[in-house]
Swiss-Prot record:
Pfam families linked: AIG1 (PF04548)
Coiled-coil region: none
Protein name as catalogued: Immune-associated nucleotide-binding protein 1
G1 as annotated region, ranges: 15-22
Expression by tissue: Mostly expressed in pollen.
Induction and repression of expression: Up-regulated by brassinolides. Down-regulated by 2-aminoethoxyvinylglycine (AVG), high CO(2), isoxaben, and propiconazole treatments.
Amino acid sequence: MAEQECPVTNLLLLGRSENGKSSTGNTIIGEKYFEVNLFGRDMDQRCKMFRALIEDGPIINVIDTPGLLESSVSGDYLSKEIMNCLTMAEEGIHAVLFVLSITNRISQREEFTFNTLQQIFDDKILDYFIVVFTGGDELEADNQTLDDYLREGCPEFLTRVLKLCGGRKVLFNNKTKDKGKRNKQLNQLLAHVTDIRQQNGGIPYTENMHRKIKFKNLKYSNVKL
């Protein structure tokens, strides 16, 4: 299939660097394009996009957003950078991957970011959310599944996030060299992306959509006043 005939899927990565966000991007692409150090932290300081060509599948553009969940980042900066990502992805964003780790506790920063995204981009952005859990190797070592992990004690915040995004979740093992396992987790992710496309009528989240939502909310607040 010629590249220009393939559908394009734009995926936006959000999450703390120590959650394996950039490593997840590399796993999706199949190459180590996003730089990470020995501790799994991002080395890049700017939003970057790299492309993967999936055999008999879509063209995948993965956009990484390093540093957006750091404690020093303001809501205004977060909004600006996400808008830059929307501009970078000309066709719009087909899915937002909210990357968490089973080995790290959910921080107040992640709650702040999630709540800020809702405020800035309205609940519509949640229609494109997929929660990606890293640390699949840890669960495999303990002979556990993701559902086992969540049943053991799911924080209230995470329960709310999963409910708001329709329960879309996937477990990633970014350390495995097993091609079959890598393909399986990628296919699970892409199945969620297909679900998002169907639910949204094939329409990605775009900069223009954000402007319309922002104008509508502003108009509504003026009417209330």
